[in-house]
């Protein structure tokens, strides 16, 4: 599916097809349609109730606009009178329902398009009821929109009105043709371009429409192409569904394609656009930055008004929830000093929080299964604290698959973005991973009991939470060794800390513990003698490192026992000073299996000599130690939760931004492998999660992520 991406897979718009069908052939002789196949499409796609529109979702805005346009097209050519009358009957019966519709779901340009169609219908003798309160409000909105962008500006510079020219009077076409897109369209709108062809007979308009009529067998979408939109949103959906690892080559190509079309002013839904929007720009910025491309945050200055507000399009009449949602998500990838993203985060968060407080999380661009849930998760669990399996588990409940429908000039579908195949695969993959995690959890409990870790102060609740954090962060089945190494390392660190602190060991006793470990061997064979099992905590530690090292030796032929032991020796000798994050990240990087396209192991010596590695290590240790301190104070104080703005301390936020920059930027051809870099951020985000979320939230996440099967 992803390999066949081109200009975009999208459903047909009866409204736009009707405008194309209205175009006359100027070849001389008798009056005839330029595109007879469009009339055939209209004739073949009337719904049973007499309307035209999206069959899966009933929106009166969508049905009225599509039906009126198709009726006008059929009456204009005096064909299919029965279908025409059936469509008129539908409108007479349902026009009053416009009063009841949610205005947030009004199609793009509806307030301009519907009045224009009504005027044409009246000239054709089509009797349409117009004296309804809802329709009068539509006319009022039309005047507001047209006044927002004065006619002189409209003819001088590209604006969103180029997308909705159809039916507008008093246009200066000699000026508008200079604003035509490279593909011959007017802002990629078939309806707007068809109207321009009617008025100008422009060859480029004709070429654009002819190409798409042929491609879509007589019909046309409400907008085309949608290449950037499709590339970006398909990747976003796959990532959030937890499926991206299956499509790495395709995703890399998608992101590279977007990067080739990127401009300093941003992008819109299609390449080579003269108009940019904040929604596509924010999604593009976020995904490009996540994949290591250099993109400047200054791009968002083009979407900020003098009053400090951010907008999607200049001259917009309403603000889209999803536009601000994606701006908020993009802002969380800020680097140090990017004040424009600080402003964007503040503005978008305030907008979304107000919408949520007013129970008003409806969007003008999409009707989706659970937009309030998506926005709520983003506000409640910021990106730094969002563990991959937690996000995916919630998104599996929020993603509507085939049922999600987009709002353009009409309702439309994007099958490469929203489809049940993604959803079915994601559910199957999640449940398979969860089953493996549950089996691992059973084995962790057996290990815990066999090692008598409870006697040293490790509780079963802490055991579960520690394994959960590892499994929610490194969830892939092929990363079982890394996941278990993380979990057992964290469990043993907590057990030893508890043993040292709560058993009130003397300094000499602690030193004896460390000395015993340092002088023992990971693999101890003396004169052919076997390693002697011991019940002590030191023995448990030695045996665990033995097993971890042996697993890697047998599976990949690498001997990691000495660097693993060295990492533990360092932690034991400085455990009071922190350093948990360093031990975890060193363990993860030693355990990298080397499988897959990107998974390349590097020796401890090679890593230690890499300046970027040392920068990452220093940054990770610094921020994780602060987060751990914050978490302990929160537990001890009982009310040390994050404040309402989601900020811990200025220092922590600043250091997280620096770490993100170190991880996602590519410094040179000698840069570290991406997975090694990601491990630093993965560990830091797990610490942030523990510090950010209260215990009740964590317990809820554990139950949902580890034990609640996706149905």
Curated annotation (Swiss-Prot):
Annotated organism of origin: Isodon japonicus (Scutellaria japonica)
Family affiliation: Belongs to the terpene synthase family. Tpsc subfamily.
Keyword flag Isomerase: yes
Coiled-coil regions, chain positions: none
Protein name stated in the entry: Ent-copalyl diphosphate synthase 1
Keyword terms, alphabetized: Isomerase, Magnesium, Metal-binding
Needed cofactors: Mg(2+)
Broad class of enzyme this protein falls into: isomerase
Domain of life, per lineage: Eukaryota
Domain remark in the UniProt entry: The Asp-Xaa-Asp-Asp (DXDD) motif is important for the catalytic activity, presumably through binding to Mg(2+).
Catalytic activity: (2E,6E,10E)-geranylgeranyl diphosphate = ent-copalyl diphosphate
């Amino acid at each position: 599916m992803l390999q066949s991406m081109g200009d975009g897979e999208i459903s047909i718009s009866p409204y736009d097809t009707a405008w194309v069908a209205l175009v006359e052939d100027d070849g001389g002789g008798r009056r005839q349609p330029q595109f007879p196949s469009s009339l055939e499409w209209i004739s073949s796609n009337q719904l049973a109730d007499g309307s035209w529109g999206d069959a899966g979702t009933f929106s009166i805005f969508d049905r009225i606009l599509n039906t009126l346009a198709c009726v006008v097209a059929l009456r204009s050519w005096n064909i299919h009178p029965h279908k025409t009358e059936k469509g008129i009957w539908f409108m007479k019966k349902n026009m009053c329902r416009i009063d009841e519709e949610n205005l947030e779901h009004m199609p793009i340009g509806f307030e301009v398009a519907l009045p224009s169609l009504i005027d044409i219908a009246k000239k054709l003798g089509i009797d349409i009821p117009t004296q309804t309160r809802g329709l009068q409000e539509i006319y009022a909105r039309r005047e507001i929109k047209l006044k927002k962008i004065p006619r002189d500006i409209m003819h001088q510079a590209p604006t969103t009105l180029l997308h909705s020219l159809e039916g507008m009077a008093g246009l200066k076409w000699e000026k508008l043709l200079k604003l035509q897109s490279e593909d011959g369209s007017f802002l990629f709108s078939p309806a707007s371009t068809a109207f321009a062809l009617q008025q100008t007979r422009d060859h480029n308009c004709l070429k654009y429409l002819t190409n798409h009529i042929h491609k879509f067998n007589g019909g046309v979408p409400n907008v085309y192409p949608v290449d950037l939109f499709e590339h970006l949103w398909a990747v976003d959906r796959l990532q959030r569904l937890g499926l991206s690892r299956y499509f790495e080559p395709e995703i890399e190509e998608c992101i590279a394609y977007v990067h080739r079309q990127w401009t300093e002013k941003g992008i819109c839904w299609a390449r080579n656009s003269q108009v940019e929007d904040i929604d596509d720009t924010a999604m593009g910025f976020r995904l490009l930055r996540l994949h290591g491309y250099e993109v400047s945050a200054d791009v968002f200055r083009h979407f900020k008004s003098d009053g400090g507000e951010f907008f999607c399009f200049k001259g917009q009449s309403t603000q889209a929830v999803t536009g601000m949602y994606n701006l908020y998500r993009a802002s969380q990838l800020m680097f140090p000093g990017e004040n424009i993203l600080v402003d964007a985060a503040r503005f978008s968060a305030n907008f979304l929080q107000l919408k949520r407080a007013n129970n008003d999380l409806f969007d003008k661009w999409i009707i989706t299964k659970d937009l309030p849930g998506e926005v709520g998760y983003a506000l409640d669990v910021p990106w730094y604290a969002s563990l991959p399996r937690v996000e995916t588990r919630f998104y599996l409940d929020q993603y509507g698959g085939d049922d999600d429908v987009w709002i353009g000039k009409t309702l439309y579908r994007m099958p490469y973005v929203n489809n049940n195949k993604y959803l079915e695969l994601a559910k199957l993959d999640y449940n398979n991973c969860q089953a493996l995690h549950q089996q691992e959890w059973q084995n962790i409990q057996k290990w815990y009991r066999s090692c008598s870790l409870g006697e040293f102060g490790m509780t079963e609740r802490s055991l579960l939470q520690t394994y959960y954090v590892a499994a929610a962060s490194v969830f892939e089945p092929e990363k079982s060794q890394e996941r278990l190494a993380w979990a057992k390392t964290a469990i043993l660190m907590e057990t030893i800390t508890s043993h040292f602190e709560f058993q009130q060991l003397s300094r000499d006793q602690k030193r004896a513990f460390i000395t015993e470990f340092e002088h023992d061997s990971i693999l101890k064979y003396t004169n052919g003698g076997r390693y002697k099992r011991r019940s002590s905590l030191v023995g448990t530690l030695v045996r665990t490192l033995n097993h971890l090292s042996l697993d890697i030796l047998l599976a990949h032929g690498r001997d990691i026992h000495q660097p693993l032991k060295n990492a533990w020796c360092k932690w034991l000798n400085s455990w009071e000073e922190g350093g948990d994050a360093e031990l975890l990240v060193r363990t993860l990087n030693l355990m990298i299996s080397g499988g897959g396209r990107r998974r390349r192991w590097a020796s401890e010596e090679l890593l230690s000599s890499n300046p970027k590695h040392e920068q990452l290590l220093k940054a990770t240790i610094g921020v994780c130690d602060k987060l751990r301190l914050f978490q302990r104070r929160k537990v001890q104080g009982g009310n040390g939760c994050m404040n309402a703005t989601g900020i811990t301390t200025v220092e922590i936020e600043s250091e997280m931004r620096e770490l993100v920059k170190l991880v996602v930027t590519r410094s040179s051809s000698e840069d570290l492998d991406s997975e090694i870099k990601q491990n630093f951020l993965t560990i830091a985000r797990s610490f942030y999660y523990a510090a950010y979320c209260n215990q009740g939230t964590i317990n809820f996440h554990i139950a949902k992520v580890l034990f609640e099967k996706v149905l």
